[in-house]
Every structure is written in C-alpha cells, then in structure tokens.
Amino acid sequence: MELTREKVLLLTFLRMQYSHILPDSIENRVISTEAPEWELDKSLQDLLIHDYDYSKTSFSSSPPIVANDTVSNVRKPSDTKQVNGAGGQVNHSRAEDSDYATSDLSESSDVGDDDNSCIFSFSKVPMQKDVASIKEEERLDPKISTLNNIDAIANLKLTNMVESSQAVNLTSSKQSSINQQSSVSTDYDDLRSISEESFHLSQGEIPLTFPMNSSLTDTEADAVVAVDALFPGKQRGTHNTVNKARSVSNAKAPTSALRALLEHKENSSQNGPLAENFATFSGHAESNALRLNIYFPSSESPSKPLFVELRKNVLVSEAIGYILLQYVNQQLVPPIEDEAQNPNYWNLRIVEDDGELDEDFPALDRVGPLSKFGFDAFALVKATPAQIKENQAAYPFKSKHPTSIPEANNKTHIRHTSSTSSQSQKQAQDVKDTLNTSHVVQVRLPPYGDNARFCNIEISKTTRLAMVLNQVCWMKQLERFKYTLRVAGSDTVLPLDKTFSSLDGNPTLELVKKKVRDKKGSTQQLPTSSPQNSVYGSIKKDAQSSTYNATDIMSSNTYQEFLVWKRQPVSFMGRHERLLAIDGEYVHIMPSESKNIFETPKTSSIHAGSIILCKQSKKSPCNFKMIVSKNRETKRYDFEVLSALEAAIIVSRIRALMNTVKKIN
C-alpha cells in the first residue's frame, strides 16, 4: 500500500489526543494541531505496513489514541485553557465532553514546513461518553434525567416490538409479514417523533401530550408527571390528562342491544349445529385430502369457486354440511337463512369445465362417498321441496339452536280446548312419532342359506327403499345397478320408489341380482297395510308394460363401430386413436389398427347400466364425455371425433341404450 502525505496526515491526527476544543456547537467544534514533519514519520510507516486495525479497539473514557513521540506540541487529555483569538476568552474543555468530532479538511498546507499549522474539522463522528459524565450531568440538571428516561422508554418499546416481530411464524403469507413490518415501522416512527419532541421541552416549543386512545403504562405515566413537575408554567400534559388517559384506556366501550344480538348470532353460526356435526370432516391436516372447487349458482359470484379440503372417505351428505359451514363462516353473499343451513336442503351436482351446472347429470347420491366420482369441481344447488321432504324424513337434522321462549302465565292466560280436539291432536302426534321412530331392518346377502350373511340398516318408516339399497351396496362395496331388493322367502321384488311404511311389520329383506329377477319374472303380490302406498298395482303394471328384454336387444343387429380419439392430457401423446363399438348391452373401447409404440392393446368393456352420463360438449361440439360407475368409483372418458354430427350420433345411440337397459332392469 502506497503511503501518501494525506494518509500520513490523517493517521497522525488519529493518534493524537484531543486538545484545543473550541466552545462552539457540536457540529462546528474544531480541533487544531500542528502538522508533523515528513521525515519523522518512520514509526507511522511501520504501523501501516502491519495493517493495524483501530476499529477493534474498545473505547473507555476516551479514544485509544496515543501521541507519537516524534510529534511536537501535543497535549495530553486534561483540562486545558485556550485563548480564543484576540478576544482573550478562556475556555475550559475536556476530550470526554465531545459528543462528535468532525472530518472535514478546512485548511491544508505544505506538510514539510514546520511553521505552517493545519486545522481539521470533523462532522458527526459519534464518540462514546463517559458514564460518570452522564450521571454528573443528570445530577446537575434534573431535566436531562427526565428526558433520558423518556428516551429509554421509547427504546424499550422499540426493542419489544422488534423481538415480537422476529417471533412471527415463517410460514405466514408475504402480505401478512409486510403488514406487521409496516405496523412496527409506524410505531417506531411515532416513538422517535416523541423522542425528538422531548428535546424541545426545555424551550417550551412543543407541549407534551398523549393521544386519548393510547394505553399508558405506569412508567410512562410517571414520566409525564415528572415532566409536568419540571415545567409547571408551560403547556404540558397534567396529572388530569394522565388519569383521564388511564381511565379511557381501561374503560369498556358501551355495547348496544343490537350489537350484542349480532355478536350472539355470529357466535351461534360458529358454534351451531353445522360446526358441531361437520367441522370434523375437514381435510386440512391430511396429505391425501380431497381438494375441491365448489361453485354456488345462487350466489352473487356464481363463477367464483370456493376452495375446500375434505377428508378422503367423506360421504356426499357430510361434504354438503361442511361446504355449508365454510359458506357461513366466510360470510359469502347472499347469506343463507337459518332454516336453510341444513344439508338436507341442498344437493351436490357435477359442473362443466367452465363451472356451469351440468343439467344432464342428476344430483349425487347422498349416501355414497364423494371420492368415487373422481371430479375436483362441484356445484351446491338448492334441492326441490320434494327432495327436501324426502331427505329430512330419511336423515333428520335440526338447523336451529333451541330458543328460550318465556313461559306464559297460566293464571292470566287460560286456553280452553275441547276433549275432541285434544284427542285428535294426540293421535296425530302418535302417528308422527311412529313415522319418525327409527327401525333396524335386516338385509340378507347372497348366497342364501343357513350361513347367509346379514346387514343391519337403521331407517325410519318414511325412508325410501332406494336409500336402503344404496346404503347396503355402499357398505358391501357392490355396484348398485346390478342389485335390487325383495322380501325374504318370496319372489316379490320391491319397487324402490316406495317407502318402508308400505310394508307390513318389519320384514327381512334380501339383496338379489337383477338377472335372477328377470329369469323368474314373478308377479306375486305382497300384502300391505296402506292402500295408498300399496305395491300390488305397481308390480303388476311394471310386469305388463315391460315389453323389452335382454334377448331382444342381443338378437337385434345393434353392432356399430366409430373411430374416436381418447383424450388424455397427462399422457405424452395427448390423445390416442380408439375404436368405440356398441354391441348389445355393452360399449367397447378397443385399440385401433394403427397402434404406435406408446400404446398397449387393451380393450375396455362397459355395461350400459354402469354408464351414468354421456354428453356432448357445448364449447367443442366435436368432443363428448362418458362417465362410468365402476367399483364404487366413477371414471371419466373424454373422446373427440371428426365432426359435431358424428359426436351427436354417438351420444344419442349410447343414451338410447342406457334408457333401454334402465327399462329392462
């Protein structure tokens, strides 16, 4: 490193003791000394060669600067007397009294000339004060002590806020972190402004006041009282101000009856029946949770979905309850009435890719698992009055909290009723209780015999037999469209649209395959207790009106073949050429003759009874989809053809086959 005159001059000055401090302000204090000779700085050159680091030296009462023996006219740090110019004013000063030194070169001269002197001016280089000097100043001037206490309070608050901000969770969002940092920065600016204003208290320029909504601690209040005592004649915060601020911060805001009612309603929604029954179905803590987008066609934003996370094995009815809970908690618009906060009032439907409701697909089976449908987007729609009545009868749910009604004064309000009306009301209540009473029905599973298995289902008298069949097939992992119900020990097949109250007593039911029913073709009648809900006519009518059978379809020339492309977005190719064949009751998806190396020769045969939906796309008429129920789950097939007309023909043929098989079964 090259040693220049300027570097030697600066280093020589830093190794000197402070002397000749002028009595000016902090920013204008000047330190003067005589410049050393160039030839006498060999020791300084050696010091620079060894790279001496002054920044690592700890400060005590004065900077660690030792005067060089080669430098002349250098005074030790002690009380000095200095005569300022022609005025002859004598000033006493110490090196420790300097808060700042300056670093501005005001005058320069030839370093080699001994007669010339150099004056340096340094600005805002902080030096550490002696603790003894600070205590001495506070003892002589109580005002300084009070101001230092206020600064200490501000610094303590700032330290606490910084420590609390460091404890913020690292996984919080970026916006949350920015808000917390801005809050800390705002509080810091407020405290620094209070600290800066405190320096002007001695001049009476700024009154010391605290906002009325701020919360003062005991230490802060004592500091305000101390400042008021120091400056009694000027406009300051008085004891009454502190006491008033304390009373305002400790007092409770008045609460109106309307606000209390709204808070009670909000707490009721968070702790109501929805939260009690469906909050446990959240899949937020599970890795394999169902992550769905739920659309609300009746809301103000029907195209904006609500993201929910559900457990993997949740049922459709349970998913509806949890979705309603999230709708209420997030306060979406319009709000749902208390009576409608009931899963029986709603249905879950499948939507298109753009979120529009798929009108061709019916409401999802409430007793089945939601995961079997294989979709990630659904729509929550209002059920019809008939569906609400049916769901409420099968699965009663109370959507309201029991409200406390003041009891009437029997002494002043007496209601006379006749014996006839009271008796009729009692009979109606007994009938209602009987219908709502739960029963356990036994369903025998094939194969039948002495070692036959049974499945117990808890139902009510108003439960439809279709719900019983759905629940049995769900519990035993069976395909619902292949089975039906009959009374045990008979060949009478039960219509699934009737209720359990249409049966006499509590008979044992049997689960039977539909093909067995078709072979026997029984039309036996079942005795019932209610003529209105009798199943005689329905069974005989179905047997007489059913002119289709499986042999007619199989014997007819119904084989058709179409060239389609199966769309697979996840695949490397994007789409694969396939042959879609309609043969009897089955739809076959076969590989085409022009196979490539990425395809495997695999044929999928789908029964028409397992096809849930077949629909042509509205946005892309050349595309159509087919949804199939298989092994308690649903699978979706997306196909593409050359023209919209060909897609319409395929969809119409598959739908006709679905209707034919449905009439037979």
From Swiss-Prot:
PTM per Swiss-Prot/TrEMBL: Phosphorylated; under environmental stress. Either Ser-61 or Ser-62 and Ser-298, Ser-299 or Ser-301 are phosphorylated as well.
Polar residues biased stretches: 65-83, 100-109, 522-536
Keyword S-adenosyl-L-methionine among UniProt keywords: no
InterPro entries: CRIM_dom, PH-like_dom_sf, Sin1/Avo1, Sin1_N, Sin1_PH_dom, UBL_AVO1/Sin1
GO cellular component: a single term: cytosol
Alphabetical GO biological process terms: meiotic cell cycle; p38MAPK cascade; positive regulation of conjugation with cellular fusion; positive regulation of G2/M transition of mitotic cell cycle; TORC2 signaling
Residue numbers of Phosphoserine PTMs: 62, 133, 404, 490, 502, 530
Effect of residue 319 to D: Decreased ability to recognize and bind AGC protein kinase family members substrates. Abolished ability of the TORC2 complex to catalyze phosphorylation of gad8
Domain SIN1-type PH: 558-659
Pfam families the record matches: CRIM, SIN1, SIN1_PH, UBL_AVO1
Segments for region (Disordered): 65-112, 395-433, 517-537
Keyword Cell membrane: no
Gene3D superfamilies linked to this entry: Pleckstrin-homology domain (PH domain)/Phosphotyrosine-binding domain (PTB)
Keywords, ordered alphabetically: Cell cycle, Meiosis, Phosphoprotein, Stress response
Domain of life according to the entry: Eukaryota
Residue ranges of domain CRIM in the record: 255-392
Consequence recorded when altering residue 368 to D: Decreased ability to recognize and bind AGC protein kinase family members substrates
MF term (GO), any: enzyme-substrate adaptor activity
Function noted in UniProt: Component of the mechanistic target of rapamycin complex 2 (mTORC2), which regulates multiple cellular processes to control cell growth in response to environmental signals. In response to signals, TORC2 phosphorylates AGC protein kinase family members, such as gad8. TORC2 is required for cell survival under various stress conditions. TORC2 positively controls G1 cell-cycle arrest, sexual development and amino acid uptake. Positively regulates amino acid uptake through the control of expression of amino acid permeases.
Quaternary organization: The target of rapamycin complex 2 (TORC2) is composed of at least bit61, pop3/wat1, sin1, ste20 and tor1. Interacts with the sty1 MAP kinase.
Record remark on domains: The CRIM domain forms a ubiquitin-like fold with a characteristic acidic loop, which recognizes and binds AGC protein kinase family members substrates.
Family designation: Belongs to the SIN1 family.
The protein, known as: Target of rapamycin complex 2 subunit sin1
Organism: Schizosaccharomyces pombe (strain 972 / ATCC 24843) (Fission yeast)
Gene name for this UniProt entry: sin1
